[in-house]
């Protein structure tokens, strides 16, 4: 569930093609829902920030991150629980582009998502899963922040399977979808994304076809679809974003 965001940017412009991002984390990679902490991270999914191209992120008017770029995801950072506000400026300036506020609960984890093109820039606060998926399951959340492609279907292909024998885990996903977690059996999967309605084996190339990755029991992952600049043919990449890992599990 996202909190209210404000659209403050005035610049137009779009970049072509598509990439799939799920931001990798450093530092707090194993999160076990310790109640004494509230954790927040920032993901930048906006493709056309004005020059010089980076963003400074402020929390309650105090700088939190400097000069982050498109496709960046921070590690989880401890924050004081309660009402917090976040804003973004063009790096090195105090030209604010957008802001958002919300209540951050004790013991919870959040993603501050920066999305859309600059002309309609917005920030959204999402509550992340901070508890394990059911035993034998892994939780996936897909966020579509791609502004240049239409609706997509998303597949999780088990090891040794083919797209022609699979059914999509999600169909008709579009920009700024309302995200929720989906539990699937833990195991080894490849993420494949195709335009909605694509018939497997019809000759249409996937927008993305990832390598096989092992997902351990109890894990939770967020995958963000973003525009990829300077590419004439739509393409995708995937980087895993770790919302939760069991303290005893390994990938």
Region roles according to the model:
Residues 28-251:
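Intrinsically disordered, low-complexity polar regions and short flexible loop motifs
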Residues 2-16:
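Bacterial N-terminal signal peptides that target proteins for export
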Residues 23-27:
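C-terminal motif of bacterial Sec signal peptides marking the signal peptidase cleavage site
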Residues 17-22:
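Hydrophobic helical h-region of N-terminal Sec-dependent signal peptides
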